[in-house]
């Protein structure tokens, strides 16, 4: 929906005359000079890390002082600035701190900056040509890279969907979500380049995975989107990347997975912290999240059971396509899937969703499928 000002500044004679006077150095009001704001002088607590958001957590500028319900600022004004005049209402729909906050969000933001990497130069791409991966494994990698790009696009879209809806007072959280989007964009980049650099190109999109991702991205509230995107999807991706790192057919693939794992681990850490903070301040919402997961956990089945995911994983884990390799790979993938579910449920329990392990249909489903 478009927004139009009540006035056209091209037609504002008063503003034009004011600009003329200022250009001549006349009639400076300097009303901003004595703004009704808190004066502070900050210094890094750890010079090696520099001045961090945690160092800036002081007084009216800090996030600890934020109220639970954000009632006074719906504009773009930075937290701690003097609010005056008619600032626009941007229509934020997430105005409750405990709906989105996590105690570790400022630290995760700083970590994401400190550990940034560039796919173009931080991987030894030339090594792929010097020591090519066997064709069957290269094809499996290309398919898995295709699938994982779809997952990264889903995680990116989830963060992007909520970013403009969250009140600007929660600036550290919004800054972290921006870096999470950058992480996922970087994953799309590196996975695409890996598939194209190995001689195979991209393979086949996954219908079941994309349907599952769409459902997770369509969660009606941020807490539901977070538990579904950061814990459910994040646990799946973290498990897959760690497994591929364990069976990586080349040093390039090992380094790629190690770098992606550190980014994905941050996403999961934020998700755990967000759910924990949310339930600590709104314990009555545990029933809502439990009900949401009752309905959403089938999406993990759609991801894990996608032929475009499970089959290339079997070949990579087995080391090839010979019958005995497929058999061995299948067993390793079965253990991987069980591990993903167990770690996801453990994270839910640790975040405050007590009884999730007994309530979830995932363990029973996996047991029946073996």
Language-model segments: residues:
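Charged/polar positions within long, soluble alpha-helices
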Residues: 157, 189, 193-196, 243, ...
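A beta-strand-loop signature enriched in Asp, Gly, Thr, and Trp
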Residues: 256-260, 267, 272-296
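Terminal targeting/low-complexity segments that flank the catalytic cores of oxidoreductases
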Residues: 1-160, 164-170, 201, 220, ...
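Active-site-proximal alpha-helical scaffolds that flank and shape metal-associated catalytic sites
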Residues: 193, 197-265, 295
């Amino acid at each position: 929906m478009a927004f139009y000002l009540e006035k056209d500044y091209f037609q504002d004679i008063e503003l034009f005359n004011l600009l003329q006077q200022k250009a001549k150095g006349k009639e400076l009001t300097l009303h901003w000079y004595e703004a009704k704001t808190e004066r502070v002088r900050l210094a890094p607590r750890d010079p090696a890390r520099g001045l961090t958001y945690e160092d800036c957590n002081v007084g009216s500028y800090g996030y600890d002082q934020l109220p639970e319900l954000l009632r006074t600022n719906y504009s773009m004004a930075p937290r701690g600035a003097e609010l005056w005049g008619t600032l626009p209402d941007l229509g934020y729909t997430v105005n409750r701190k405990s709906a989105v906050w996590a105690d570790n969000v400022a630290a995760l933001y700083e970590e994401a900056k400190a550990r940034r990497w560039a796919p173009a130069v931080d991987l030894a791409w030339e090594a792929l040509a010097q020591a090519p991966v066997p064709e069957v494994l290269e094809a499996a990698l290309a398919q898995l890279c295709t699938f994982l790009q779809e997952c990264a696009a889903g995680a990116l879209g989830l963060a992007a969907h909520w970013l403009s809806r969250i009140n600007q007072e929660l600036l550290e959280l919004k800054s972290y979500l921006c870096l999470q989007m950058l992480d996922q964009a970087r994953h799309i980049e590196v996975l695409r380049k890996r598939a194209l650099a190995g001689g195979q190109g991209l393979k086949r999109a996954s219908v079941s995975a994309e349907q599952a991702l769409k459902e997770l991205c369509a969660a009606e509230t941020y807490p539901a989107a977070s538990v579904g995107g950061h814990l459910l999807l994040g646990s799946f991706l973290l498990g897959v990347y760690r497994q591929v790192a364990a069976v990586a057919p080349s040093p390039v693939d090992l380094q790629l997975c190690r770098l992606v794992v550190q980014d994905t681990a941050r996403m999961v850490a934020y998700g755990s912290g967000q759910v924990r903070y949310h339930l600590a301040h709104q314990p009555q919402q545990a029933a809502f999240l439990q009900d949401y997961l009752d309905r959403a956990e089938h999406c993990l089945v759609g991801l894990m059971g996608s032929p475009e995911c499970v089959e290339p994983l079997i070949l990579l884990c087995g080391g090839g396509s010979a019958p005995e390799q497929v058999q061995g790979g299948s067993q390793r993938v079965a253990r991987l899937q069980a591990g993903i579910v167990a770690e996801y449920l453990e994270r839910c329990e640790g975040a405050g969703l007590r009884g999730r392990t007994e309530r979830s249909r995932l363990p029973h489903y996996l047991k029946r499928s073996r």
